Curated annotation (Swiss-Prot):
Pfam families: GAF (PF01590), Sigma54_activat (PF00158). The gene is norR. Residues 479-498 bind DNA. This is Anaerobic nitric oxide reductase transcription regulator NorR. Pathway: Nitrogen metabolism; nitric oxide reduction. Residues 187-416 form the Sigma-54 factor interaction domain. Keywords: ATP-binding, DNA-binding, Nucleotide-binding, Phosphoprotein, Transcription, Transcription regulation. GO terms for biological process: phosphorelay signal transduction system. One of its GO terms (molecular function) is DNA binding. The keyword Protease does not apply. The keyword Transcription regulation applies. The modification 4-aspartylphosphate is found at residue 57. It comes from Escherichia coli O7:K1 (strain IAI39 / ExPEC). Required for the expression of anaerobic nitric oxide (NO) reductase, acts as a transcriptional activator for at least the norVW operon. Activation also requires sigma-54.
């Protein structure tokens, strides 16, 4: 196959047509996969020696949550270093990062792989990866043709990232600084609640307002505070953390405001408090609802007047500190109960943010699971850690009262258990590796299969036919929707349906 001028023109038009939309990256990767007829493709952004998936097609959903560090993925490192088209032979000894991550083909290793590094000028900004199950799948394309695709994709990615940068900074095109890849935060999630939270973070980060971050335990409030600080004008100065719940009353005031030598028994020298440490930066007060009323009054004075007094000192010190506070309590209820000052609540909650619990974030649980799987893979030196379909189903139906923190611990424990029961450096997480209490999975809508004399192949094909028919009926005969429901690739589903006689 060779690309005609019309085909290349159509690709360019399609890539640029969606560039201002939220689904810009998915449109790009879907178009390229259709043209190149590959089993799986991914668009990756390069940042700090790791590749971050922006869009995938034909790969398991948890890939979007993974962060591919170059030192743990020799193929991706080769792509980053090459500066040109990279073709990996079918018998390459370098492990493919997507082995076990193509739905419906978990037991098979990727055979054909092409990597296209994407550049903006001399800067590496990303990569396009193309994978196939047939060893010679990409032999029909010349390197020159693939370079053209890479150039088109690089231009589209560069423009899209620049637009995203301008949107996040609320800048006009004429005010734009030279293109820089956006900083990666570990706030992983594409659910509506997380998308809205990220937008609100972008809005408030550019200001100097105090922010109250509320959310259940384990939802990631500290990550929100970090994201606000890193996107703010104060990012070059310190972000200082203090857990108010861990402060004994006897030392809480000293921790916040510091003390002078001799202020109390054990004060053998002058000591700066957290407010002084955070001067010109940001102070994150976690579990703010645990502060005593006496300390709340002193904190209020700092927010009102911008000065502090060290314990044992009559002099005031001016500080310029932005305060971010977090709580898992309902502070309005605490105010009504007399346990939290109303005036302090209003000072802190100038711009309130609410972090959604994991049970309300839909498929984000799978993205986060992928992120933690990749962390475990690197930490334990494994070649791959993947989720079985049963494990994904279990994770999606568990309520996670401990939220993201509970998911992280569950993945780490499951990897250790799975590794202990399997030799080698490949780990597949099954449902039985998770110890969740009282998880009720929806009953499968199994078809009534008559008991007849069939061999195993015939029985398997009969089951596959009925499963595909049910999926098609439930999805109004939409093949793409049926493929998503069955967690398989739409191209593979088409091929299977043809083999089973379900379509021409």
């Amino acid at each position: 196959m060779s690309f005609s001028v019309d085909m290349l023109a159509n690709i360019a038009i399609e890539l640029q047509r969606g560039i201002g939309h939220q689904d810009r990256f998915q449109r790009l990767i879907t178009t390229l996969r259709q043209v190149l007829e590959c089993d799986a493709s991914a668009l990756l952004r390069y940042d700090s020696r790791q590749f971050i998936p922006l869009a995938i097609d034909g790969l398991a959903k948890d890939v979007l949550g993974r962060r591919f560090a170059l030192e743990g993925h020799p193929r991706l490192e080769a792509i980053a270093r090459a500066g040109d088209v990279v073709r990996f032979p079918a018998d390459s000894e370098l492990p493919d990062p997507y082995d076990g991550l193509i739905p419906g083909q978990e037991s098979l290793k990727v055979h054909a792989c092409v990597g296209l590094p994407l550049f903006a000028g001399q800067n590496l900004i990303g990569a396009l990866t193309l994978d196939g199950m047939q060893p010679d799948q990409f032999d029909v394309f010349s390197d020159e043709e693939l370079r053209l695709i890479a150039a088109l994709a690089a231009g589209a990615l560069s423009n899209a990232l620049l637009i995203e940068q301008l949107e996040s900074q609320n800048m006009l095109p004429g005010d734009a600084a030279p293109f820089e890849a956006l900083k990666e935060t570990q706030m992983i999630g594409l659910s509506p609640g997380m998308t809205q939270l990220k937008k609100e973070i972008e809005i408030v980060a550019a200001s100097d307002l105090n922010v109250l971050i509320s959310g259940e335990t384990g939802t990631g409030k500290e990550l929100v505070a970090k994201a606000i600080h890193e996107a703010s004008p104060r990012a070059v100065n310190p972000l200082v953390y203090l857990n108010c719940a861990a402060l004994p009353e006897s030392v809480a005031e000293s921790e916040l405001f510091g003390h002078v030598k001799g202020a109390f028994t054990g004060a053998i020298s002058n000591r700066s408090g957290k407010f002084e440490m955070a001067d010109n930066g940001t102070l994150f007060l976690d579990e703010i609802g645990e502060l005593s009323l006496a300390l709340q009054a002193k904190l209020l004075r700092v927010l009102q007047y911008g000065d502090i007094q060290r314990v044992g000192d009559d002099r005031s010190l001016r500080v310029d500190v932005r305060v971010l506070a977090a709580t898992n309590r309902d502070l309005r209820e605490e105010v009504l109960a007399g346990r939290f000052r109303a005036d302090l609540f209003h000072r802190l909650s100038v711009f309130p943010l609410s972090v959604p619990p994991l049970r309300e974030r839909g498929d984000d649980v799978i993205l986060l699971a992928g992120y933690f799987c990749e962390q475990c893979r690197l930490r334990l030196g494994l070649s791959r850690v993947v989720l079985s379909s049963g494990a994904r189903n279990l994770l999606q139906h568990y309520s996670f009262p401990g939220n993201v923190r509970e998911l992280e611990h569950a993945i780490h424990r499951a990897v250790v258990l799975a590794r202990a029961t399997r030799s080698g450096d490949e780990v597949i997480l099954e449902a039985q590796h998770f110890a969740f209490p009282e998880v009720t999975l929806p009953p499968p809508e199994a078809a009534a299969v008559p008991i007849v004399k069939q061999n195993l192949r015939e029985a398997t094909e009969a089951f596959q036919r009925e499963t595909i028919r049910q999926a098609q009926a439930q999805n109004h005969h939409n093949w793409a929707a049926s493929a998503r429901m069955l967690e398989t690739d739409v191209a593979n589903l088409h091929r299977l349906a043809k083999r089973l006689g379900l379509k021409d």
